[in-house]
Structure formats: structure tokens, C-alpha cells
Design a protein with these regions (language model features):
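Residues that define the transmembrane beta-barrel architecture of outer-membrane proteins
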Residues: 6-12, 49-51, 107-111, 159-163, ...
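Surface-exposed extracellular loop regions of Gram-negative outer-membrane beta-barrel proteins
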Residues: 6-44, 50-54, 58, 169-187
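Short loop/turn motifs that connect adjacent beta-strands in outer-membrane beta-barrel proteins
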Residues: 22-32, 62-67, 120-126, 175-176, ...
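Transmembrane beta-strands of outer-membrane beta-barrel proteins
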Residues: 30-36, 53, 67-71, 111, ...
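Transmembrane beta-barrel strands of outer-membrane/channel proteins
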Residues: 36-40, 57, 71-75, 115, ...
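Membrane-embedded beta-barrel scaffold of Gram-negative outer-membrane proteins
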Residues: 62, 102-156, 161, 278-283, ...
């Protein structure tokens, strides 16, 4: 089979944006930052013109200057790329691929509320952030994931939503080092053929920890610990369609640990290099078999079995880093 295609399209894009800062009246003032804008585009391939307004406001209240409240909303468009406009149709055993010039950009309306709190504990800086979001989606282009292959349906066939909560505590548990803990909850689904199904990226929860510490009595030796636990992604048998993604992979679990030694520090000397670190990491410390995808095997009775493909097991990594 051989095919030659020539596509000539024109895309015009632009945006307008402004920021307005003001403060409330009174002896104790609250400070506001209002950011608003408009983005527009036109694509000659499908003749679509999109206009997406968006705005955000942040407030530092008078009762505590270490607190920031944020809210943002807007209408967003994601233009389709080549694999999304490619529509494959099989008729009488013949597979035909066409480019869908009637396709539209995927649309999303965002509502995001956030809270930041900066504080000190034992004279060390910390920051706690919380963000809740809801995104209403239209004209979605669904896709199937089979192992590492992604196949798009080639048309706007779904509506959906994404809602979630992200929490993060960031700070210097040890002076001069960065550590954080994050916790996320999410639900993202799409309605296809009258049925709500999870999107391929529907990861319902995730916990991540990054902790750095120095050895007692010296700052030349540094230890880093990383932990991750996340919900497994939905999947189903190949060629069964998104409506039958009724299974979910096991949770992803991983622990990494690393040791670093500072070979050089500039200090007060004149040098282009600030410091040099030599480190060794043990990735996937406990050798957990995390599932990447599934290979489906069919027996003589047409019964299918999912055989897991695993991600990389335990590995040792040596690195040399220079900071200029």
C-alpha cells in the first residue's frame, strides 16, 4: 500500500492580556491582582475560529499577608493534531484512512480555586498549597491505549469532566534543602454512547514524598528519599472500545533512595562552577513489579487472558552534577 498526501493549511493565532493591581481602602489593606485576557485562533483546515476568554484574581487579605486566595476561570480550546484528525474506517475487510476536515477543537471550561499559606516552623520557611478544580469538557476526541500504542477515534464523539483536589506541603525540613509532600484526588470521565466511562488518564489518587537531609555534623553528605503511590489506570481488552474498559491496573508503588557527596564548593573563590556533586541512586529500592500495560492472549475457546508487562525493576544510577 502506498499513499501520498499534501496538506496546505494556515493557522492564525493571537492573544491580548492585561494585569490590574489594586488595594482595598482602610488602614489595613487587602491586595488584589486581576489578570484577564483573550486568545483567538483560526485554522483553515477545518475553517474553525475560536475565541477563548480567561481571567484570574488573587487576593492577599489584610488579616494575614502570608495567605493568598486565588480563583481562575476561562474557556480553553485544544486544536487537534495529525493523529486526532486521522479517521480510520474498515468496510468489508478494507481499511481506509481519511483526514476529517469537519473535526473541531476540544473545549474545556475551567473553574479553579486555590489557597496558599506561607509560614515558619523552627525558623524554617514552609508553604502549604491547596487547589480544587472542575473542568467541563466538550467535543472530546476519544482514544484507545493498547500497550504503548494510542489510537484515536478521529472525531468529536464525547463530552466529559475532570474534578479534583491537590494538596502540597513544601519547605526546608533541613536548612538549605527542599522537601515536599503532595496528595491528589481526581475523577475524570467521559460520556460515550450514553455511558459514563473513565478516561484513560483517570488516576483517582496519588501520594508523593520527596525528602532531603544531611548527615549529622557535615553538609558534604546528602541523602534523598522519594516515595510514590498512585492509583492504577483503567484498561480493557483490545478492540473492545472505551465502553468496555472495565478493569483497572494495580496501584503504582515505588521508593527511591540516593546518596550524594559534594566534591567541590566555590565558596569565596572566583570560579564559574558553584559546586560539584557525585551521587548514587537506587531506583525502585524494593524491586516492586509495577504494571505498564497488558499483553492479551487468546486461547482456542476465544477466552482472553491479560498478561502484564512490567516496568523496570531495581536499578543503580550514578550521576555527576555541576551547578554553574
Amino acid at each position: 500500500m502506498r499513499s501520498t498526501n499534501h496538506i496546505y493549511t494556515t493557522r492564525i493565532e493571537g492573544y491580548l492580556q492585561d494585569t490590574y493591581r489594586f488595594a482595598s481602602r482602610g488602614e489595613r489593606q487587602s491586595f488584589f491582582t486581576f489578570n484577564y485576557g483573550l486568545r483567538f485562533s483560526h485554522w483553515s483546515f477545518n475553517g474553525e475560529t475560536t475565541v477563548s476568554p480567561r481571567a484570574s484574581i488573587a487576593m492577599v487579605p489584610a488579616f494575614n499577608n502570608d495567605i493568598t486566595f486565588r480563583f481562575s476561570t476561562g474557556l480553553y480550546y485544544q486544536a487537534p493534531f495529525f493523529k486526532e484528525i486521522r479517521d480510520t474506517v474498515t468496510t468489508d475487510g478494507m481499511t481506509r484512512a481519511v483526514l476529517n476536515n469537519k473535526i473541531k477543537s476540544q473545549q474545556s471550561i475551567h473553574f479553579v480555586g486555590a489557597f496558599d499559606y506561607r509560614f515558619k516552623m523552627k525558623k524554617r520557611p514552609y508553604k502549604f498549597s491547596a487547589e480544587a478544580y472542575y473542568k467541563l469538557m466538550h467535543n472530546l476526541i476519544p482514544y484507545n491505549v493498547n500497550n504503548v500504542k494510542i489510537t484515536y477515534y478521529g472525531g468529536n464523539q464525547c463530552d466529559g469532566y475532570a474534578a479534583g483536589l491537590d494538596l502540597k506541603l513544601y519547605g526546608e525540613f533541613v536548612p538549605g534543602t527542599d522537601s515536599w509532600v503532595t496528595f491528589s484526588l481526581m475523577s475524570t470521565q467521559q460520556k460515550m454512547n450514553g455511558r459514563w466511562v473513565p478516561m484513560p488518564t483517570d488516576q483517582r489518587y496519588a501520594v508523593n514524598v520527596h525528602f532531603t537531609d544531611y548527615f549529622p555534623g557535615t553538609e558534604k553528605w546528602k541523602m534523598t528519599l522519594r516515595l510514590a503511590i498512585a492509583d492504577g489506570l483503567p484498561f480493557g481488552a483490545p478492540h473492545s472500545g472505551l465502553e468496555h474498559q472495565d478493569f483497572r491496573a494495580p496501584a503504582y508503588k515505588r521508593a527511591d533512595i540516593g546518596m550524594s557527596y559534594r566534591l567541590y564548593e566555590r565558596g569565596y573563590r572566583k570560579s564559574a562552577v558553584k559546586n560539584v556533586w557525585l551521587g548514587i541512586d537506587c531506583l525502585n529500592l524494593f524491586g516492586i513489579n509495577n504494571v505498564n500495560s497488558y499483553y492479551w492472549v487468546t486461547d482456542v475457546t476465544d477466552q482472553q487472558y491479560a498478561v502484564p508487562n512490567y516496568l523496570t525493576g531495581r536499578q543503580i544510577n550514578v550521576k555527576l552534577s555541576l551547578k554553574l
